[in-house]
UniProtKB/Swiss-Prot annotation:
Signal peptide: none annotated. Belongs to the Maf family. Gene3D superfamilies: 3.90.950.10. Nucleoside triphosphate pyrophosphatase. May have a dual role in cell division arrest and in preventing the incorporation of modified nucleotides into cellular nucleic acids. It comes from Cyanothece sp. (strain PCC 7425 / ATCC 29141). One of its GO terms (biological process) is nucleotide metabolic process. Keywords: Cytoplasm, Hydrolase, Nucleotide metabolism. It is found in: Cytoplasm. This is Nucleoside triphosphate pyrophosphatase.
Length: 195
């Protein structure tokens, strides 16, 4: 069995991996995302995912597969990561409701067994429901949107306020499972090698 390391403290990403039989070692990268200033949204999330994975990979003494991810919501050309505070989350939801956005997740898989690195991008369209200010305030009061890129969790209460997903649902939660399978295959592995 291959050692699999998740370079993220995200409970949602860990749970996605566990749901497919991968029980990763979890390391938080503590990479300073503000140190990266890239205007292109696609390049930004891929670069951040790579940096997070590299920070963790450089700390490991033994070979492993290291997965780093970074997600943002792009709505009307603007990037939204995690909200700063409840007021920010409320303002975001007021601008997001009734709109469509793209959830971008950069994925980096570093193979320390073969000294190879793959960097990929998954994009999923998210159509948000039109919800009232009261619903927004109640949702933000749960605290859930404060821990999520785009201020919503598809696999939580936020799923109530998403009308449609076009593309990969697991990508919206934090990592694309189909893309991970493709990345493992490209490196010559099967997901079962990580079970």
């Amino acid at each position: 069995m291959l050692q699999f390391v998740l370079a993220s403290a995200s409970p949602a990403r860990r749970q996605l991996l566990q749901s497919i039989g991968i029980n990763p070692l979890v390391y938080q990268s503590n990479f300073d995302e503000s140190s990266v200033a890239i205007a292109d949204h696609h390049e930004l999330v891929q670069t951040l995912a790579r940096c997070k994975a590299e920070v963790v990979a450089n700390q490991l003494a033994a070979p492993a597969l290291v997965l780093g991810c970074d997600s943002v919501l792009v709505l009307q050309g603007k990037i939204y990561g995690k909200p700063k505070d409840p007021a920010d989350a409320i303002a975001r939801w007021q601008s997001m409701r009734g709109q469509s956005g793209e959830l971008l997740t950069g994925h980096t898989l570093i193979d320390l067994y073969q000294n190879k690195t793959l960097v990929r991008l998954e994009i999923t369209q998210v159509d948000f429901a039109w919800i009232s200010d009261r619903q927004i305030a109640a949702y933000v009061a749960t605290g859930e949107p404060l821990n999520c890129a785009g201020a919503f969790a598809l696999d939580g209460r936020g799923g109530l306020f998403v009308d449609r997903i076009v593309g990969c649902p697991s990508n919206v939660i934090g990592l694309s499972l189909p893309l991970l399978r493709k990345m493992l295959t490209a490196l010559g592995y099967s997901p079962a090698d990580c079970w």
